[in-house]
């Protein structure tokens, strides 16, 4: 009888121990579930090679689960994206391409958003929670590569707009001086001025640097017009997109897309860790170069043959 009473007295304590034991087992998983960040990746179109490469490189770095959305898939309409953004309630969103970014910014502008693969990001609506990797390289890096291949180029012409690229132009001018290069600029207010500005600029320079500026380029026709004007003067064109070399540009320095994805992953990791990022929008770290050797020979340009092995692709 005494043993039975003793057992009854201990029952409440045993029950409490069992309860806390269960809580102890469940607590780590609950904490883990709460602490795992919710990451959403929106790709404007995963069938585009450069977008896909950035996405794959991003996923190789990020170890946490990622919810992926391909806007190239017809099932994703604006309304379904809106529902997903609210349902998932992500801690951070990685947007590849302009379409992805604009959707995220439209529906959840107060969320942390990291972008990449967007030409001329300065034209986009941004918030204090916007981060990204620019699609435009550091001007000093580009000029270093220009001079490596064409060491005799001393004067480079640039068309720019006061609205989007005036600050970039001033910085590029200062960096060029340190390399012994003079950058001569012509400001425009809209693309209708392209031809007249080029006709004034080209006779004074050794090469033309075609930069990313929405006032300058908004259609393929704008690009072709500029390339044709430069070709008529046999002025080599340096630019920022590899496909331009196929259309007549002499030398292009573009971003390396897998590196872009890894950089974006680094930004995402930093933001989720609460790190203070000095540069919210970073310059790309990697490059991909194309030399149109056919144009070089057509124009009779002097070039550094010893540096050809540094070029990623040569058009013969």
What are the functions of these language-model segments?
Residues 22-23, 32:
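Intrinsically disordered, low-complexity serine/threonine-rich segments
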Residues 9-22:
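Sec-dependent N-terminal signal peptides
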Residues 33-316:
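Short hydrophobic alpha-helices and adjacent helix-cap/hinge residues
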Residues 24-25, 97:
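Residue-level detector of bioactive/disordered segments in secreted/extracellular proteins
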Residues 1-10:
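N-terminal secretory signal peptides that target proteins for export/translocation
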């Amino acid at each position: 009888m005494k043993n039975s009473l003793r057992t009854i007295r201990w029952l409440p304590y045993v029950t409490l121990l069992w309860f806390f034991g269960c809580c102890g087992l469940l607590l780590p998983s609950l904490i883990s579930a709460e602490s795992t960040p919710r990451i959403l990746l929106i790709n404007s179109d995963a069938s585009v090679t450069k977008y896909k490469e950035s996405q794959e490189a991003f996923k190789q770095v990020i170890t946490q689960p990622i919810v992926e959305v391909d806007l190239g898939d017809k099932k994703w309409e604006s309304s379904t994206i809106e529902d997903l953004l609210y349902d998932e309630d992500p801690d951070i969103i990685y947007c590849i391409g302009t379409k992805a970014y604009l959707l995220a910014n439209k529906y959840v502008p107060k969320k942390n958003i990291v972008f990449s693969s967007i030409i001329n990001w300065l034209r986009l609506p941004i918030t204090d929670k916007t981060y990204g990797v620019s699609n435009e390289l550091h001007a000093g890096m580009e000029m270093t590569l220009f001079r490596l291949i064409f060491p005799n180029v001393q004067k480079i012409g640039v068309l720019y707009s006061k609205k989007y690229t005036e600050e970039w132009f001033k910085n590029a001018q200062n960096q060029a001086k340190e390399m012994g290069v003079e950058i001569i600029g012509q400001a425009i207010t809209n693309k209708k001025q392209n031809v007249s500005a080029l006709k004034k600029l080209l006779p004074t320079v050794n090469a033309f640097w075609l930069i990313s500026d929405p006032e300058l380029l908004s259609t393929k026709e704008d690009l072709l017009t500029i390339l044709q004007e430069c070709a008529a003067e046999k002025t080599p064109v340096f630019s920022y997109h590899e496909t331009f070399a196929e259309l007549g540009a002499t030398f292009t320095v573009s971003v390396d897309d897998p590196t872009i994805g890894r950089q974006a992953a680094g930004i995402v990791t930093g933001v989720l860790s609460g790190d203070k990022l000095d540069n919210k929008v970073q310059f790309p770290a990697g490059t991909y170069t194309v030399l149109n050797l056919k144009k070089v020979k057509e124009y009779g340009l002097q070039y550094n043959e010893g540096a050809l092995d540094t070029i990623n692709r040569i058009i013969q």
